[in-house]
Amino acid sequence: MATAETTQETPTAARTGQQFLDGLRGDAREIWLNGEKITHPLDHPQLAEAARTMARVFDLQHEHAGEMLAPSPDDGRLVNVTHLIPRSRGDLERRRRAIELTAAATAGMMGRTPDYLNVTFACFAGRADVWARRGNEQGAANVVAYQKEMRDRDLSTTHSIMNPQVDRSKPEAEQAAGEVALHKVGETENHITVRGARMLATLAPYADELTIYPGSDIRPQDGNYALAFAIPMGTPGLKFICRDSYSKQRSTFDYPLSSRFDEMDAVVIFDDVEVPKNRLFLCGDTEGYSEVISDTGWRGHIMHQAFTRAYVKLSFALGLGHLIANTTGVVRFDHIQEKLGQIWNMVELTRSGLVSAEAGSSLDEGGVWYPDDRPFLALRGEMPKWLPYVNELLQLIGGGGFMATPSVADIQGPLAEQIEKYYQAAGADAERRIRLFRLAWDYIGSDLGGRGELYERFYLSDSWRMTALAYKIADKAFAESLVEQFLQEQPS
């Protein structure tokens, strides 16, 4: 994968931030927030800042073109490296660097920037052979064609892979008479019709297209629920119902993260939505519904993206803890150093896992370069515990200082002189100290911080399930042999 700098003469498919924003106006999407129908996020004060952040993400690839763009294998135009199917260890390393740059722009707070699904569909297209099983050659061809469209149009996409939580003790087809979960209700020569709901479409207000693919196994008799496809956000019959916004026209001083990085989550309603068959990847194949996740290498590739972002987010947390401890002078205490050391351990173990996965990577049977997923399987069980625990450590490092945080209106108001005197710290003046503590509180204690903690606990499934799975699939031969050598000794 060659990389290149952009110039005015360099053909590129990579969009700018302005092109991204213009693209959001191109459809009649139906986004609902607090009972209000919204057609464009820039037109709504609670969504506008995150739209601008997303535009910044698109601009970033041009500012770092040498690291984030590479020639398309089809026509040589420059595209984001996360769109490309990795064919070498170097491709994985370059992809990680591009993901890291994107994550750094949002302190790792936005988990669903476009690189997430770019990596997913590059993986899917690279293993079209898995999608083609049991006579689904057309679905496989559609996956390949759609991935090229994502790449060449530089789309921002969202996905929704779980059905609503009606009665988790039952299969989807038996919950609410089978009418709530997304399912096929009709078919013509050119399209299928789907009805039901899915959750959660993170990034929905800022996406060009919605993708649907498997999130869990499905019973053989539930073929109407075994679906994978992609459609534009403005497709008739699609409705996106958002949770509360955490932006709320907040000051970037008072809420430096919430004001900019709320990527939003939405439930998707499909009101007899027509899906063109050239956008249909899988329909009715309940075996394939599992295999396109288990046999394409998706888990290893998506964990490569996820833990790169987690590395950045953990590094940000380490920076917060380090600066708070030095600002207030508590860094001299051993128990504070121990807490900071714990965060550093998490940062370094995550970095080491990424490097190890790349160093042990190899070519899979489909010709895609696949990261060694063993380090990722270990991290997948621990990361949902680490990130919430980091919040606890930061609380213990900052203590009551998180409550001594006047707003920017106070700092600029009639009490400015007193605030400057009484809010100073050993290592910073009052304004810097207040900025730092408000930033950290937005990370650990605001509504965005709470959403982030919940997200980190569950977005790659829950910790106990992943830890149990890691044990189940782990190679235990060497460990077992160490014990067997003693058990098989002749008594002396």
PLM regions: where:
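N-terminal-proximal low-complexity accessory segments that begin disordered
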Residues: 3-58
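N-terminal low-complexity or amphipathic/hydrophobic leaders
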Residues: 39-103, 365, 459-461, 470
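Generic structural signal for well-ordered, non-transmembrane alpha-helical segments
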Residues: 48, 52, 148-151, 312-315, ...
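Glycine-rich flavin
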Residues: 70-209, 215-229, 234, 239
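FAD-binding core of flavoproteins
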Residues: 159, 164-306, 471, 475-491
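Extended amphipathic alpha-helical segments enriched in small hydrophobics
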Residues: 305-363
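Short, charged, amphipathic alpha-helical segments
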Residues: 337-341, 369-377
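Alpha-helix capping/hinge segments and adjacent helical runs
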Residues: 374-492
